[in-house]
């Protein structure tokens, strides 16, 4: 039951952005997630302090350096892995 509540909470906080070019609201950061097809997500900036999110950022740095192909922060992991990690950060 806790897992279901965790997923529902993640859906509220971790939202998929519909406008790929739109600016992120104050307090949020747009990231592109996926291996072949990238999807844009908005995540709270507070995630930047979390070790598990920092691990995703390190993976991104190793693969892309500071040259991100989408023009924004790209996290090269499967979408379900990203959702799993971020759902634990609430």
Curated annotation (Swiss-Prot):
It comes from the Eukaryota. It is a peripheral membrane protein. InterPro entries: SAUR_fam (IPR003676). Keywords: Auxin signaling pathway, Cell membrane, Developmental protein, Growth regulation, Membrane. Induction: By auxin. Pfam families: Auxin_inducible (PF02519). The keyword Ribosomal protein does not apply. It is found in: Cell membrane. Its main location: membrane. One of its GO terms (cellular component) is plasma membrane. GO terms for biological process: auxin-activated signaling pathway. Belongs to the ARG7 family. Functions as a positive effector of cell expansion through modulation of auxin transport. This is Auxin-responsive protein SAUR24. The lineage of its organism: Eukaryota, Viridiplantae, Streptophyta, Embryophyta, Tracheophyta. The gene is SAUR24.
């Amino acid at each position: 039951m806790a897992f279901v509540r965790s997923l529902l909470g993640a859906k509220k906080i971790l939202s998929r952005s519909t406008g790929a070019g739109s600016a992120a609201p104050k307090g949020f950061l747009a990231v592109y997630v996926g291996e072949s097809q990238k999807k844009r997500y908005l995540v709270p900036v507070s995630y930047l302090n979390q070790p598990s999110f920092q691990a995703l950022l390190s993976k991104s740095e190793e693969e892309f350096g500071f040259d991100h192909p989408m023009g924004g922060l790209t996290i090269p992991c499967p979408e379900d892995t990203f959702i799993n990690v971020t759902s634990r950060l609430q």
